[in-house]
């Protein structure tokens, strides 16, 4: 496994702290993430509120259409959160009791709980040692007659392996993208959102784009799923308002959709700026061939993450571990396993990945401060 920006020991960090310059009082703290908000966002939100049509209006419809056109999907439907999007994906594929869905062991817990909430079983697969996405070899070894789908996570904005598409096609199972962190990522010329059968996005404030609150988006590349997707987020109702299948209220508000439409206009330039910032920080994170990283997070491997985070904190820079506990080791799942699940890369890597700021709002001075902190805390 490559030592990506391998960090120093506690003693070395202590030496740098003692010998380095203290944080100046005029220096503002550098946030790990910073949601975008400007006069255009505010104007859109106020306009949506003033319209008196706060739900099921033109803003949400337009946002879905524009998002689908942007990412290359057949259809896109806004919803209340990334977690809601994952639940909708399960229902859209009729996944339920007796079914299995293969998910990565290292991801946000919602990837796995979406499977459990429909009564299906999440089967945890290990991650790659270089790119940290779900490992195709481990996925293929865990496919059974019960496997209904694979959820590939574009972790931190890194596109998952194109082999997942081949594996799913050869076994006749669906591929779901968890693209919560991958707005603007590209894999072999396709944008996240148009790689799998279904994709799920999050607009949580820390993501590459947001909606002024909670929000999500479900996209599909399969025309036969498009109309059903619209029904599932609105109580399973068709155009006659009859509920023809089991659904629930996952609709996005007009206010959130109006903000999302504004932010969608800027997302390409924001992702480009994230890539520029990532390059400027001169890290050695490996990027998959024939892909473009979206840099939701710039994560570095550290043998002593607590010490590194403390050092960055002393310099007024936010940093934290993503994600310290593999999903299978969370209490909600570990209590239900009758045997130890072997996910060696998850166990080795998950608690060592330190995320540092890379967002597009960073000034030149802030980028330099982050570079200096990296220089003083890496080999």
Kindly label every feature range from the protein language model:
Residues 7-53, 58, 315, 357:
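N-terminal "arm"/small-domain region of PLP-dependent enzymes with the aminotransferase-like
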Residues 12, 20-21, 61-65, 73-76, ...:
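PLP-dependent aminotransferase class I/II
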Residues 118, 170-171, 315:
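Helix C-cap/helix->beta junction micro-motif
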Residues 121-131, 320:
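Short beta-strand->loop structural element characteristic of the AMP-binding/adenylate-forming
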Residues 107-112:
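Conserved coil-to-alpha-helix start sites within the AMP-binding
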Residues 97, 103, 124, 175-177, ...:
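Hydrophobic residues in well-ordered beta-strands that form the structural core
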Residues 130-211, 217-219, 355:
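Active-site phosphate-binding strand-loop segment of PLP-dependent enzymes
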